[in-house]
């Protein structure tokens, strides 16, 4: 994922958390904030409680892959995806299904 599609700074994360809306399902929480830009930006947060660095990075790679596969359908928002406990046990298809479900609830797809 290109750098222009990432939310990296702490200031941006805090703005999304404080001013944005949120939706959740059992596996993900999404905070989102509408911004005037040409494309979406995403930040991904995976807690250390979910596993070691290898597991957490694998989860982040899967989330990024799902988001890139839905790139044309995603609305122009800044959003943060937070993985909840249990995500580490999901295979790619189940993770994709859960993530797309919560994105549809939020109206981002």
Curated annotation (Swiss-Prot):
Keywords: Endonuclease, Hydrolase, Nuclease, RNA-binding, tRNA processing
Example of a GO cellular component annotation carried by this entry: ribonuclease P complex
Principal EC category: hydrolase
Catalytic activity: Endonucleolytic cleavage of RNA, removing 5'-extranucleotides from tRNA precursor
Gene3D superfamilies: 3.30.230.10
PROSITE patterns: RIBONUCLEASE_P
Record-linked InterPro entries: Ribosomal_Su5_D2-typ_SF, Ribsml_uS5_D2-typ_fold_subgr, RNase_P, RNase_P_CS
Biological process according to GO: tRNA 5'-leader removal
SUPFAM superfamilies noted in UniProt: Ribosomal protein S5 domain 2-like
UniProt xrefs under Pfam families: Ribonuclease_P
GO MF term set: 3'-tRNA processing endoribonuclease activity; ribonuclease P activity; tRNA binding
Domain of life: Bacteria
Keyword Lipid metabolism among UniProt keywords: no
EC number of the protein: 3.1.26.5
Family, as annotated: Belongs to the RnpA family.
Function recorded in the entry: RNaseP catalyzes the removal of the 5'-leader sequence from pre-tRNA to produce the mature 5'-terminus. It can also cleave other RNA substrates such as 4.5S RNA. The protein component plays an auxiliary but essential role in vivo by binding to the 5'-leader sequence and broadening the substrate specificity of the ribozyme.
Subunit-structure text: Consists of a catalytic RNA component (M1 or rnpB) and a protein subunit.
Protein name in the entry: Ribonuclease P protein component
Gene of this entry: rnpA
